Regions:
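General "foldedness" signal
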Residues: 48, 57, 68-70, 132
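Ampiphathic alpha-helical segments that act as solvent-exposed interaction surfaces
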Residues: 26, 30-34, 96-145
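Intrinsically disordered, low-complexity regulatory segments enriched in Ser/Thr/Pro
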Residues: 62-124
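Negatively charged, low-complexity tracts enriched in Asp/Glu with abundant Ser/Thr
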Residues: 2-62, 139-145
Length: 145
């Protein structure tokens, strides 16, 4: 459970997350923040056991947005990793495009970002995909017609 901006975040986390992550308060809090950023933007989420990632999906009138966010926040030395990989797919019934990005969790020298910064990083990726990458999607689709 995490108090963040006046809200209590308590999203369900799968018990199959890496053991080191489940034993780290910071890792659990970061997962809560990432899930919160996506659910606030209208995404539903599930955990993909086979791929070991969170999958966030939202459909609008024409497009389906799917974000896959890696897990494994705690490194072998017990510190929080610098970032989590994010793979995005935007598709409609005729066409699909993919994008790769990162949600940063620490500074380059390993200092944990503030929870506001981590939440903002996740939200920024959503905005970039929904605006810039969607525009690229339509441009690429037009070129392929």
């Amino acid at each position: 459970m995490l108090d963040f901006k006046g809200e209590t975040l308590n999203y369900d986390l799968p018990v199959s997350l890496p053991k080191a992550d489940m034993q780290s308060k910071e890792a659990i809090d970061i997962y809560q923040l990432i899930i919160h950023a996506f659910t606030e933007a209208g995404y539903e989420y599930e955990y993909n056991e086979e791929e070991k990632c969170f999958v966030f999906t939202r459909e609008d009138d024409e497009l389906t947005y799917t974000f896959s966010v890696d897990v494994g926040l705690v490194s072998g030395d017990g510190n929080i990793v610098n970032w989590l990989g994010v793979w995005t797919t935007i598709e409609d019934e005729d066409f699909e495009t993919e994008n790769e990005d990162k949600i940063y969790t620490t500074t380059d020298d390993g200092k944990l970002l503030t929870y506001e910064e981590i939440f903002s990083n996740a939200g920024s990726i959503i905005q970039i995909v929904e605006n810039d990458i969607t525009e690229e999607f339509y441009d690429e689709k037009r070129e392929n017609l």
